[in-house]
């Protein structure tokens, strides 16, 4: 089975907790704080493994959670950073954020890496909070939570040439005679439902990878007939070979097929029209093919170069392969999105918080609910088992303007305020 799209969950490791500790050595009066910081949580890193060809492995494991950092220790010892969690993906994998649709990484070359979920930083130990007025603080931070998200993995086949056209126009047959690939060939539509790859060698010692892509139908750009799953593979090809059935045995008009397929490519991704396209008139060994070809040429004009072939008898195939090889040599690769810098094989996704720092809503029972990335992160990093940490959290809330915002919403002494799953009383 060929798996070309899958949804998975990734979570960076939480940072280790900071420690509250003090020096107790002999001959060290008033030893002072000695709590170490927690270690950084591990990142979830995707790495390209050239030996992989599908996303099949993700059918069986869809949750990837990196290890948290080691907790801080006494005597000022910091916790150890956890080893990053490496997730192997095949070349041609595009990683998208499931919620926003943003492309996080486009992984194409062996060994290329991308950080998909960052681990949290370690919490600070009490030695970090010592001041002239508070030389022995009873306060330490919990580790920062690691980033978590659902991501969509899409595999777009890496091929120099893509064969496109309606079902049963002879794409699989053509691939089978020009390469050692053995795609399934039968007398019914959609025999090919997954891409087939073959290495083509020309007579002058040139070679390229050709992909037999599943047949397209009208409305494919809108998802009709699994159109989105088929069209995504064309985005990586450098040259498009448009195969048209000139026999007319299917009852379709070759020119209408030509126009329909090109419209589908344009509607799906306008940039596909920038790629060189070779028009192949197939099944020229059939009785009415020559007459249909002449009518087709009259409609498309002299600007479109047409290669009449018969994939079955191999008539015209040699000239076609030479033309395709020439186009590949003069055509650059087309990235699927704008690339800022390709000088490094590593990609770092920089996470930026979105939206407001906090939001306040009120439930039907009068409880005030505070939410937002910043306040929830601050809450999770607070050690509520220590009074000094609780007082610090209260100061942080005031500094963020939450107290003032609660008063503006009508909060009074004794009202219940909720953050995540925890409730406490509002004191004015």
Swiss-Prot record:
Signal peptide: none
Record-annotated Obg domain positions: 1-158
The organism's place on the tree of life at top rank: Bacteria
Sites where the protein binds Mg(2+): 172, 192
Residues annotated for GTP binding in this entry: 165-172, 190-194, 212-215, 282-285, 310-312
GO cellular component: cytoplasm
Enzyme kind, highest EC tier: hydrolase
Record-level GO BP terms: ribosome biogenesis
CDD domains in the cross-refs: Obg
Keyword Nucleotide-binding in annotation: yes
Names of the cofactor(s): Mg(2+)
Keyword terms, alphabetized: Cytoplasm, GTP-binding, Hydrolase, Magnesium, Metal-binding, Nucleotide-binding
Entry-linked InterPro entries: G_OBG, GTP-bd, GTP-bd_Obg/CgtA, GTP-bd_prot_GTP1/OBG_C_sf, GTP1-OBG_CS, GTP1_OBG_dom, GTP1_OBG_dom_sf, OBG_GTPase
Record-annotated OCT domain positions: 350-428
Residues of the OBG-type G domain: 159-329
GO molecular function annotation: GTP binding; GTPase activity; magnesium ion binding
Entry's localization field: Cytoplasm
Family per similarity comment: Belongs to the TRAFAC class OBG-HflX-like GTPase superfamily. OBG GTPase family.
Subunit note: Monomer.
NCBIfam families noted in UniProt: Obg_CgtA, Obg_CgtA_exten, PRK12296.1, PRK12297.1, PRK12299.1, small_GTP
Function text: An essential GTPase which binds GTP, GDP and possibly (p)ppGpp with moderate affinity, with high nucleotide exchange rates and a fairly low GTP hydrolysis rate. Plays a role in control of the cell cycle, stress response, ribosome biogenesis and in those bacteria that undergo differentiation, in morphogenesis control.
Name of the protein: GTPase Obg
Record organism: Bacillus anthracis
């Amino acid at each position: 089975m060929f798996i070309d799209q899958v949804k998975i969950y990734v979570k960076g490791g939480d940072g280790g907790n900071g420690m509250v500790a003090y020096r107790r050595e002999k001959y060290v009066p008033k030893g002072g704080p000695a709590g170490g910081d927690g270690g950084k949580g591990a990142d979830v890193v995707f790495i390209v493994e050239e030996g992989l060809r599908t996303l099949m492995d993700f059918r069986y494991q869809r949750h990837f959670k990196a290890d948290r950092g080691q907790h801080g220790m006494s005597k000022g010892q910091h916790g150890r950073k956890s080893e990053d969690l490496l997730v192997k993906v095949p070349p041609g994998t595009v990683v998208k954020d499931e919620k926003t649709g943003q492309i996080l990484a486009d992984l194409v070359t062996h060994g290329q890496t991308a950080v998909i979920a960052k681990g949290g930083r370690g919490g600070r130990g009490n030695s970090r909070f010592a001041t002239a007025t508070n030389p022995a603080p009873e306060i330490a931070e919990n580790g920062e939570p690691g980033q978590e998200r659902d991501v969509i993995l899409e595999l777009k086949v890496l091929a120099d040439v893509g064969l496109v056209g309606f079902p049963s126009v002879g794409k699989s047959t053509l691939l089978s005679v020009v390469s050692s690939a053995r795609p399934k060939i039968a007398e019914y539509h959609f025999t090919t439902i997954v891409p087939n790859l073959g290495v083509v060698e020309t007579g002058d010692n040139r070679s390229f990878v050709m992909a037999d892509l599943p047949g397209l139908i009208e409305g494919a750009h809108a998802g009709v007939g699994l159109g989105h799953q088929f069209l995504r593979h064309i985005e990586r090809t450098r040259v498009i070979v448009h195969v048209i059935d000139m026999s007319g045995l299917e009852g379709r008009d070759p020119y209408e097929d030509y126009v329909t397929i090109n419209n589908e490519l344009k509607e799906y991704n306008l940039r596909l029209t920038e790629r060189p396209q070779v028009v192949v008139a197939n099944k020229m060994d059939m009785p009415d093919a020559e007459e249909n070809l002449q009518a087709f040429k009259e409609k498309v004009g002299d600007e479109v170069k047409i290669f009449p072939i018969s994939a079955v008898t191999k008539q015209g195939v040699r000239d076609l392969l030479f033309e395709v090889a020439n186009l590949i040599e003069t055509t650059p690769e087309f990235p699927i999105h704008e690339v800022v810098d390709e000088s490094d094989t590593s990609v770092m996704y920089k996470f930026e918080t979105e939206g407001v720092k906090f939001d306040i809503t009120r439930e039907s029972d009068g409880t005030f609910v505070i939410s937002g990335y910043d306040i929830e992160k601050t809450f999770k990093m607070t050690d509520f088992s220590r009074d000094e940490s609780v007082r610090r959290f209260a100061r942080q809330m005031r500094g963020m303007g939450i107290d003032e915002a609660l008063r503006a919403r009508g909060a009074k002494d004794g009202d219940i305020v909720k953050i995540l799953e925890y409730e406490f009383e509002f004191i004015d």
